[in-house]
From Swiss-Prot:
Gene3D superfamilies in alphabetical order: 3.40.1380.10, ATP synthase, gamma subunit, helix hairpin domain
Identification of the protein by name: ATP synthase gamma chain
Protein species of origin: Symbiobacterium thermophilum (strain DSM 24528 / JCM 14929 / IAM 14863 / T)
SUPFAM superfamilies documented for this protein: ATP synthase (F1-ATPase), gamma subunit
InterPro entries for this protein: ATP_synth_F1_ATPase_gsu, ATP_synth_F1_gsu, ATP_synth_F1_gsu_CS
An MF annotation (GO) of this entry: proton-transporting ATP synthase activity, rotational mechanism
Length: 288
């Protein structure tokens, strides 16, 4: 019985130690989530308005073309799938959900495909299954900046402009809130500009210095902005999922500690009762 009590005490100490870790991780990711969520909320309206502006300019300037807008029709196009995952685990179903979506997309795709991974978890998953990414990015950190997104995208654009890939699709996780994140897929290249609304359909624009120069600046900036937003969405989703997972783990640890404490108290009570019974039995034997 003494050994049983000691074993329960060891388990209580172990669970309490784990609970301290999960609680600390929850607090850290809660702070990171607030910063990431603010970035997402700031980026969304900018991306939306930039898409509308680009759509109006392209629709108004008929005949204007740009390499990032041009859809290649010759031959069988090669599609690059860009997968955004985390470098670390302990984030609930965040990684496996988006990886599953990427795996399904690759299996359903009838055209030749190439894989680009951002995050260690996605890379490791596909490398283990003999699918080697043509580009991989790991250890990018938690502070996603526009400069970082542009640096990553430039390497992807190089593949596109060189003709190695003809279409780029991104599989990422859309941030809804701390407990809800949705794996999604969108086409990044060639750019599909938003349709202009009726109020702007017949507006004539004056370009300075020229339509070509304006689009040469605006089109790459649009691609960079969209990719930056997707990276922010993914990072905010990661922090939200990890904060929720660590919160659940902390609560589960609390329940386990309560059950173990109850088991310990029962074992101690049983030991005390047995000792009292032995004392009473010994006293009765002496009196007899």
């Amino acid at each position: 019985m003494a050994e049983n009590k000691k074993a329960v005490q060891r388990r209580i100490r172990a669970v309490k130690s784990t609970q301290q870790i999960t609680k600390a991780m929850k607090m850290v990711d809660a702070a990171k989530l607030r910063r990431a969520q603010e970035k997402v909320q700031n980026a969304r309206p900018y991306s939306r308005e930039l898409a509308k502006t680009l759509g109006r300019l392209i629709q108004a300037g008929a005949g204007i073309d740009h390499p990032l807008l041009h859809r290649r029709t010759e031959g069988t196009p090669t599609v690059a799938y860009v997968l955004l995952t985390a470098d670390r685990g302990l984030a609930g179903a965040f990684n496996i959900n988006v990886i599953r979506k990427a795996h399904q997309a690759l299996q359903k795709e009838s055209r030749p495909t190439k894989l680009i991974t951002i995050g260690r978890k996605g890379r490791d998953y596909f490398v283990k299954r003999k699918i080697q990414p043509v580009l991989e990015f790991v250890n990018l950190g938690d502070n996603i900046t526009f400069a970082l997104a542009r640096s990553v995208l430039s390497k992807i654009v190089d593949l596109y402009l060189s003709g190695e890939v003809d279409e780029v699709r991104v599989i990422y996780t859309e941030f809804v809130n701390a407990v809800t994140q949705r794996p999604k897929e969108m086409q990044l290249l060639p750019i599909q500009p938003a349709q202009a609304d009726g109020a702007h359909t017949h507006v004539e624009y004056i370009y300075e210095p020229s339509p070509e120069r304006v689009l040469d600046t605006l089109v790459p900036r649009y691609a960079e902005t969209m990719f930056y937003q997707l990276m922010l969405e993914s990072k905010a989703s990661e922090h939200g999922a990890r904060m929720t997972a660590m919160g659940n783990a902390t609560d589960n640890a609390e329940e386990m500690i309560a059950k173990l404490t109850l088991a310990y108290n029962r074992a101690r009570q049983a030991a005390i009762t047995r000792e009292i019974s032995e004392i009473v039995g010994g006293a009765n034997a002496l009196q007899g």
